Amino acid sequence: MDTKLLDILACPVCKGPLKLSADKTELISKGAGLAYPIRDGIPVMLESEARTLTTDERLDK
């Protein structure tokens, strides 16, 4: 996924910023507490496809 997209993409739930996960397989929304998967280089920005962040992930900066 092109990291330049992070400048223009926003979480569809809370409209907050997104962060690329360390392994580059998810876009993380701390505001919504969700992780959106990246499949074949394309972020899947659907709430129904996102997973809920764990407590540790929410607290991690």
Swiss-Prot record:
Gene3D superfamilies listed in its UniProt record: 2.20.25.10
Annotated signal peptide: none
Recorded coiled-coil stretches: none
Short name of any one Pfam family annotated for the protein: Trm112p
Cited InterPro entries: Trm112-like
Alphabetical list of SUPFAM superfamilies matching this protein: Trm112p-like (SSF158997)
GO cellular component: cytosol
HAMAP family per the UniProt record, alphabetical: UPF0434 (MF_01187)
Stated family: Belongs to the UPF0434 family.
Protein name stated in the entry: UPF0434 protein Pfl01_4174
Organism classification: Bacteria, Pseudomonadati, Pseudomonadota, Gammaproteobacteria, Pseudomonadales
